[in-house]
């Protein structure tokens, strides 16, 4: 599955429809924690999204899949983040990727109401880094905790994200995403593995994410390539 996460979105969607849906249906039937209220304690921690059809993850080119994370806190804060290796010109790509990296985080809040998960996007964090060491799970968690503290200090009065540092095309895409509250459903969840279905509107195509707790990446090897 890790090898397939870098494929084009349309190809991943087709793969899900033709190959993965029987697996998803079977996992859903075997879900040991089908009630959303039982799932809250299970999600807390750092997860690696090893495969996903969520469109916004690859709005920027060059996402490093091994340095992509989902992090949940017990206080209701949640983040999707990743490191990106910019630079697409053949002569400069290798040089730039070795020196510079771009880290991007979407800060979110989650809650369970009437046995349903709801996700609200509340901010973004971003920055260029010297690409001398990877964005490890420990660094990702520290960055997330710092972002949460900044958000708590601001309070709930201002939850409008700052898109000024993004190019106009990307900013428009994220503005549209931020306007909606996503519904999230764990088709399957245990302490180390999550199969998640997300949808922002009833008429929208649902997205699927396979995530494993960062220390347990061997749990998806049974899914066919």
Give residue spans per PLM region.
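Soluble ligand-binding/transfer domains with enclosed cavities or grooves
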Residues: 1-225
């Amino acid at each position: 599955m890790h090898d397939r996460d870098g494929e084009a979105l349309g190809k991943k969607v087709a793969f899900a429809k033709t190959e993965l849906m029987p697996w998803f249906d079977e996992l859903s039937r075997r879900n040991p924690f089908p009630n959303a209220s039982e799932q809250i304690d299970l999600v807390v921690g750092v997860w690696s999204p090893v495969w996903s059809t969520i469109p916004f993850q690859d709005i920027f080119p060059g996402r490093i899949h091994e340095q992509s994370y989902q992090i949940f806190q017990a206080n209701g804060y949640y983040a999707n983040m990743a490191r990106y290796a910019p630079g697409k010109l053949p002569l400069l790509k290798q040089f730039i990727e070795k020196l510079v990296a771009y880290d991007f985080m979407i800060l979110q809040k989650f809650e369970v109401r009437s046995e349903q998960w709801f996700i609200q996007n509340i901010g973004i964090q971003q920055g260029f880094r010297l690409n001398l060491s990877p964005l490890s799970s420990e660094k990702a968690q520290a960055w997330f905790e710092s972002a949460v503290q900044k958000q708590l200090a601001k309070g709930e009065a201002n939850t409008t994200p700052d898109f000024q540092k993004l190019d106009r095309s990307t900013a428009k895409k994220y503005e549209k995403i931020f306007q909606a509250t996503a519904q999230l459903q764990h088709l399957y969840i245990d302490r180390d593995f999550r199969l998640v279905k997300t949808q922002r509107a009833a008429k929208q195509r649902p997205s699927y994410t396979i995530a494993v707790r960062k220390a347990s990446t061997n749990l998806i090897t049974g899914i066919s390539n």
